Amino acid sequence: MKFGKYLESQVEANRYVDYKGIRKSLKRFKSEIESLNIHISELKAYNLNNATSKINSKQPSPTTATATTTTIGISSSNGGSNLLRNSISTSKFMNLSQTPLGSSTPMPSDQITAINTSKSILESMEQLKEIQDRLVKSLTDEVSKVNDFYMEREKEAQERFDKLKIQVPLYLKSKEKQRRENEKELNDHDELLSYSESYHYSKKKNKLNNNNNNNNNNNNNNNNTTSPPPLSHDQQHLQQPEIKRINQHHAVLNLTPIKSTPLSPKQQDGSSKKEVKISLLSSPILEEEEEEEEEEDDNIHDQDPEVIEMATVYHYDEDELEEVLSDNCNDNGASDEFNGSVNNNGAGSGGGGNNNSSSELNLTFDIIGSKISKSLKEISTHVVKPTTTFFQPLGDRAKRFMSMGKQKSDEALLKEAFREYYHFLVILKNYQVINYTGFVKIIKKSEKNTGLSIGSQVMSFIESQQFRQSKKIERLTSSIEKIHSELFNNGKIRDARKQLRNSEHVSQQSPTISNFFSGVCAGWTSALLMLIYYFIYTKEFDDFVRFSSIYNVYSAFGLVLLWAFIFGIDCWVWTKSHVHYSFIFELSKNKFNHVKIFQAVTLLSVMWITSIGVYMWQSVSGDDFPFPFVPPEYNPLVLFGAYMLILVCPFNIFQLSVRKWFLNTVFRVLTAPIKSVKFKDFFMGDQLSSLVLMIVQFAQFVCFYTYDVYRPEHSGGCIRYARYFNPFISGLPAYCRLMQCFRRYYDSYDSTTGKGDTVHLRNAVKYSLSIVVVVCSTLDGFFSGDSGWHSPYRLIWVVAGVSNSMYSYWWDLICDWSIVVRPKGQHWNPFKWTLRKRRMYQPTFVYYFAIFSNLGFRTTWTFTKSLPQLTNILPSYKLVVVIGIIEILRRGQWNIFRLENEHLNNCGKFRVTREIPLPYQIRDNEN
């Protein structure tokens, strides 16, 4: 594609160089210059003839010879490029031909004629100079428009960069906070695990000593008055909420006994001690093992006192606690001393008792109690809400499942914002290069066609403009690459540039695999079509099981596949015409294109045809079918199950992102008034409006497999009840679109002016008429009966249908497509319309075809009441499918021109990148 054609395809004149408009101006200037050249050439020829006649009549004087030579020089000029240079020679000729001042001799007539001719030449030269000035002014004005637009975009780029730059420290702060939390959780887990291991080691060792010295331990328990009493099972059960409350706040206690030191008399007095039953913090593993060991032991009172001490501590008064802590609290080497204390205690117990061990044990209780007191004081400063430990994990999992796929992480949002901003900078840089190259080519073409030397004057003006001199885009690009590399690529600029330029990995499928897949599908489909052809045209379809119901189910699937195929053709047209449909639909072009759609349709069509062939074969064969696992009437249900498995498959196969986009969009359509409406939402709502027949047949499919399939074949229960629920199903898409229109009007409402965009209300009228048509059609079906066209309900239905069709047809041409506009200066004339100038498709004939064919498509609803008259051509069940096919074709045509109009609107507002919501909100008091 030539560069000039590329610039002509840029339909916004104030955005890129108006190459097409300048070419038209050059043609106009060229015609004016050519007319001036003809006039000047005639004058030169006339002067040359006069000079020649003078030479023949008399000997020319030096003055006349000079004049003749000058005149010949003028005539020898070729084109307008030398006219300005020859204007000097012409002025010399006039000065030589004028009569000297003070001379009374009248000038001859031929000299007067020469002077008048020279004046005419000078006037032509002035006109030529005026044309040159006009051409230069038109070019400089175009340069100014481009420069003004570039300055606006450059300012926008700086503002977006400032917003992104503010996000960087917030992201680093959040990441550091998350890292600290992870480290804290890891340390807490390791600490609990190490404590649990040491505790159980000492517990098992003491238990072994207890079994060997049972009698000695009982004597020690009776003599040792300072040892704590054991806890009953009920008391331990009451202490569990306190354990959980401490565990929730991560109050991890380092419980280690201190060195063996002699006790003061005040400390040896056990009367000042107050027993407080507080359970120590333990890990879930510790609690499980304690429960298992409690079940094994029949009597907890037979355990060693050091085992019981982990469940009971003693609390001192504040004075006593400070004295104990100041004298004895030393945690260095606590683990080894703890093990030694346990060993010594066990040995003393075996020898008949040890006072040092008892004192050491009491001091251990003191330190444990002091640490628990501090922890409880810290916990008391926070408000603790009791939670259930059994249902909490289930609730967290449910929340994660419900939020799956809805919100991205802060890092993913920030990366996406960086990519979109980098894409914006690349487009802006291309804008600089394209416009500068366009001006250079236009200047060359202007000098070539007009012969005027304007290059130096215009180029000097271009070089002085900001869009040529500014280097801010390069600086912003390098800055964003550096920031991205430091945040996400470990300082590697090359990797950062690769990630920023390629928003996602392009998975290119091997053409061999694609061709093999197409060949297998084509061969398999051909064989099945031959089988279906044999069954149909051998008049054996009367033997098909429940043919009328199964036909409706398979036809519904076929309509969906046809709609997908037509949509793939639309994507192919948009790709060829450079309509940015992937940006409009907010999807990746690598995963959503016509090739992917055709591949999906091929796979689903093969499954559809296979199911039909198996159903026919099984119906005809009966018990002779080689695989009689599923009855023939359940084959559509199996096909539907396979389709649903593909649609909701959670694995990253079958275009997971596109399937999620489709399901999310359909959900947003069904919940229209709740959320704001995007283009993809009301576009999908319009698609569902054209698939009403498929939706109705799907409802019959549900009714068939929940009611009719268990009853005799000709019971017809669903057919009798269909007249009651079909109107609600038929009006559901129109209702969803009506709610979307109201929501869009609500979103456009301005509280300051008290008004909203009324175009959404006018659009709501169209869908209101559709609902009225459904209501009138239902009343006609219930009350008209045998009256037919003489029934007033039938007439009301016709009036509503005609009104809906004409209003929808007008809305398509004027608003949805915008291909018909009023010419400038004639807005008052309601009968004067023309095609809009900005068009993406060629040739222009397709627009006229769309105008007239859309009117025919909009009137296909008349066939629904003409079925008795048309049954001679096609059976009624086939004619209904034909009407559905026509509606899908109309929707495919509507899609092509609707996306074109949206693309042109985006170009007009310079919407080429998405607005990514930033992860961190900035408060007003933050700088």
From Swiss-Prot:
It is found in: Membrane. Residues 286-299 have a biased composition (Acidic residues). It is a multi-pass membrane protein. InterPro entries: EXS_C (IPR004342), SPX_dom (IPR004331). The keyword Cytoplasm does not apply. One of its GO terms (biological process) is cellular response to phosphate starvation. The chain crosses the membrane at residues 516-536, 553-573, 597-617, 636-656, 682-702, 769-789, 845-862, 869-889. Residues 717-927 form the EXS domain. Its main location: membrane. Residues 60-78, 208-224 have a biased composition (Low complexity). Pfam families: EXS, SPX. Residues 257-270 have a biased composition (Polar residues). PANTHER family: SOLUTE CARRIER FAMILY 53 MEMBER 1, XENOTROPIC AND POLYTROPIC RETROVIRUS RECEPTOR 1-RELATED. This is SPX and EXS domain-containing protein 5. It comes from Dictyostelium discoideum (Social amoeba). The lineage of its organism: Eukaryota, Amoebozoa, Evosea, Eumycetozoa, Dictyostelia.
